[in-house]
Swiss-Prot record:
The gene is nadK. Involved in the regulation of the intracellular balance of NAD and NADP, and is a key enzyme in the biosynthesis of NADP. Catalyzes specifically the phosphorylation on 2'-hydroxyl of the adenosine moiety of NAD to yield NADP. This is NAD kinase. It holds the Pfam family NAD_kinase_C. It comes from Helicobacter pylori (strain G27). Belongs to the NAD kinase family. Its EC number is 2.7.1.23. One of its GO terms (molecular function) is metal ion binding. It is found in: Cytoplasm.
C-alpha cells in the first residue's frame, strides 16, 4: 500500500438521535472505523458537513469514506472539492447512484484500494458566483421562486448572448452526474455521467414550447431573475439572489472525484436503479 493511501477521512450522515437510522449508523460507524484500523488505514471522523474542519487533516487524507446515502456523498464532495480529493460512498439509505459499495462489500473494496485495483472517476462540477460569494455544486444549481405565488422570469445568457427567458417555477442547471437526480424528476434528460455538458431544465414553465437544453461545458452562463429568488445547491444549501442580480455559472476547474470498483458499469447502474427493461409487475 502506498503511504499516500494510508489516511481515510470518514463522513457520517448527520442524524438526530430520534431518527430510526441513528442506532444503525452508530453501529456502522464503529464497525467501519475498526475495519479501517484492521486493514492498516489511519482514519479520522468528520463531524459535520459545514466546512468547520481542521484543514491539515483534510489535506492529509488520501480519500474520504462517506457513510450514508447520496446526500451524504454530495455534502462531502462539496466540502472537499477545493482540496482535489476523491470520495467513495458506503451506502446506508434509500438512494445509491453515487455509492461505491454496500456495507458488506467494504472490506473487499479496501483491499482493492490497497492494491490500486480501484478506478478514479472524474466528473464535471459547477462553479457558481453571486456577487462576492462563490460555491461549487456537484449535482445541480436551482434558481427557484422565493414566493409561493406567481411566475419567476429568468433571463439566460451564454457569455454576453441572451438565448432564453424562462417563465415558471424556476430552472435547474444540472451536471451530467446530477442528471439522474432532481433533473430527472423534472423530466430532464439523462446524460452520461462522464460527459462534459450542462443540462438546463425548466420547472413548470408557463410556455408549452420550453424544453430542456443540453449545452457544452465550454460556455460560461449567467442568469438574472426579475424578482428576488433562491439559489439552491444540491438541495442542501441556499443563497439569496436579488432581483436583476447576475448568477454566473461555469465549469469548475477542479473535477468531482469518485472512487469506484473496476467492475462498475454506468449503464448497468441505470438499468438496476431505474428498472429498465423490467415488467410493470416487477417495478411495483
Amino acid at each position: 500500500m502506498k503511504d499516500s493511501h494510508q489516511t481515510i477521512g470518514v463522513f457520517v450522515r448527520p442524524t438526530h438521535y430520534q431518527n430510526p437510522l441513528f442506532e444503525e449508523l452508530e453501529r456502522a460507524k464503529e464497525w467501519v472505523l475498526k475495519l479501517l484500523e484492521d486493514e492498516g488505514f489511519e482514519s479520522f471522523m468528520i463531524d459535520s458537513l459545514d466546512g468547520a474542519q481542521d484543514e491539515r487533516l483534510i489535506e492529509k487524507a488520501y480519500a474520504f469514506l462517506c457513510l450514508g446515502g447520496d446526500g451524504t456523498i454530495l455534502g462531502a464532495l462539496r466540502m472537499t472539492h477545493s482540496y482535489n480529493k476523491p470520495c467513495f460512498g458506503v451506502r446506508i439509505g434509500n438512494l445509491g447512484f453515487l455509492s461505491a459499495v454496500e456495507l458488506n462489500g467494504l472490506k473487499d473494496f479496501l483491499q482493492d484500494l490497497k492494491q490500486d485495483r480501484i478506478k478514479l472517476e472524474e466528473h464535471l462540477a459547477l462553479e457558481g458566483r453571486i456577487g462576492k460569494i462563490s460555491f461549487y455544486a456537484i449535482n445541480e444549481i436551482v434558481i427557484a421562486k422565493k414566493k409561493a405565488l406567481g411566475v419567476l422570469d429568468i433571463k439566460a445568457y451564454a457569455g454576453h448572448t441572451p438565448f432564453n427567458t424562462y417563465k415558471g417555477d424556476g430552472l435547474i442547471i444540472a451536471t451530467p452526474l446530477g442528471s439522474t437526480a432532481y433533473n430527472l424528476s423534472a423530466h430532464g434528460p439523462i446524460v452520461h455521467a462522464l460527459s462534459q455538458s450542462y443540462i438546463l431544465t425548466p420547472l413548470c414553465d408557463f410556455s408549452l414550447t420550453q424544453r430542456p437544453l443540453v449545452l457544452g461545458a465550454e460556455f460560461c452562463l449567467n442568469f438574472c431573475a426579475h424578482e428576488d429568488a433562491l439559489v439552491v445547491i444540491d438541495g442542501q444549501a441556499t443563497y439569496d439572489l436579488k432581483a436583476n442580480q447576475p448568477l454566473y455559472i461555469q465549469k469548475s476547474p477542479t473535477t468531482t472525484k469518485l472512487l469506484q470498483k473496476n467492475s462498475r458499469d454506468y449503464f448497468k447502474v441505470l438499468k438496476e436503479k431505474l428498472l429498465w427493461g423490467e415488467s410493470p409487475s416487477k417495478k411495483r
